[in-house]
């Protein structure tokens, strides 16, 4: 059985910590949502595992959400159904209950990845769609120049796409998801062209890897990035990112058909 924190969180990060601000910073981006919707095909019943505050749940289908954190469940908007309190490793549903399943920015939190993937496959008749980060590419981001520890944590936590494919079996496609400029879903790479936003403590807290490093790392990051923005160093090296329409980072979409 997965070990859970006071608010029910079942991963290495305490999702009770960001409090009520998480959903302000992690709002689904419609351009990324369109990619997920396309991957779901004609599925009418969809399971969302690690659903959080409801990001990327399609509103034109029958969705069942699973989320272990009480804080995250409380932030679900009124137009979405309440989430079931459960973990990926022990889904309380019969075999083949859903046409499709999704999990977004969640697999790095699972305590037993093979068990969670087996459960997803067990309860899903059709495609399992996973939005995650490829650990092989996480450390290519400019944040490494200021807080490499954050990206090292992220790379260690994220399972490889190949491991996910092996765990799900069947026919699997893996594709890069381009991150749009002005992305409303505030994961770290979403700020590729808006570095000032990553000086916001609440923006950092909405990305769980930042909570898993020593506070001194955050202090150094904030001090050095702020200085480089003030004197133009960041823009001299990375300024082209401010107008880049889409950034090819570590974000990937995996679609596994049985």
PLM-predicted stretches and their roles:
Residues 1-44, 55, 70-75, 127-161, 182-189:
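Conserved class I S-adenosyl-L-methionine
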Residues 99-114, 134:
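A short SAM/SAH-binding and catalytic strip from SAM-dependent methyltransferases
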Residues 43, 98-99, 125:
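Local beta-strand N-terminus motif with an aromatic residue
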Residues 45-91:
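Class I SAM-dependent methyltransferase SAM/SAH-binding core
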Residues 89-100:
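A short acidic, Gly/Pro-enriched loop at the edge of an enzyme's catalytic core
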Residues 174-258:
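Conserved Class I S-adenosyl-L-methionine
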Residues 114-128:
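A short glycine-rich, Lys/Arg-flanked "PGG" loop and its adjoining helix->strand segment in the class I
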């Amino acid at each position: 059985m997965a070990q859970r924190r006071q608010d029910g969180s079942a991963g290495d990060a305490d999702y009770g910590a960001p409090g009520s601000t998480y959903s302000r910073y992690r709002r689904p981006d419609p351009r990324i949502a369109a990619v997920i919707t396309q991957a779901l095909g004609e599925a009418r019943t969809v399971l969302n595992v690690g659903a959080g505050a409801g990001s990327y749940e399609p509103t034109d289908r029958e969705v069942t959400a699973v989320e272990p954190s009480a804080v995250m469940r409380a932030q679900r908007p009124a137009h979405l159904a309440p989430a079931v309190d459960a973990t990926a490793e022990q889904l309380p549903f019969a075999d083949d209950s859903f046409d499709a399943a999704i999990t977004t920015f969640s697999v790095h939190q699972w305590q037993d990845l093979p068990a969670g993937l087996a459960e997803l496959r067990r309860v899903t008749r059709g495609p399992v769609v996973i939005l995650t980060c490829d650990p092989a590419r996480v450390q290519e981001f400019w944040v490494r120049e200021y807080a490499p520890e954050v990206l090292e944590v992220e790379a260690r936590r994220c399972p490889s796409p190949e491991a996910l494919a092996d765990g799900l079996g069947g026919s699997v496609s893996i594709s890069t998801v381009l991150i749009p400029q002005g992305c409303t879903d505030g994961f770290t790479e979403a700020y590729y062209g808006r570095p000032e936003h990553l000086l916001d403590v609440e923006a950092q807290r909405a990305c769980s890897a930042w909570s898993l490093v020593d506070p001194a790392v955050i202090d150094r990051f904030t001090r050095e990035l702020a200085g480089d923005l003030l004197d133009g160093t960041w823009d001299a090296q990375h300024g082209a990112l401010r107008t880049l329409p889409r950034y090819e980072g570590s974000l990937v979409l995996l679609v596994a058909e049985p």
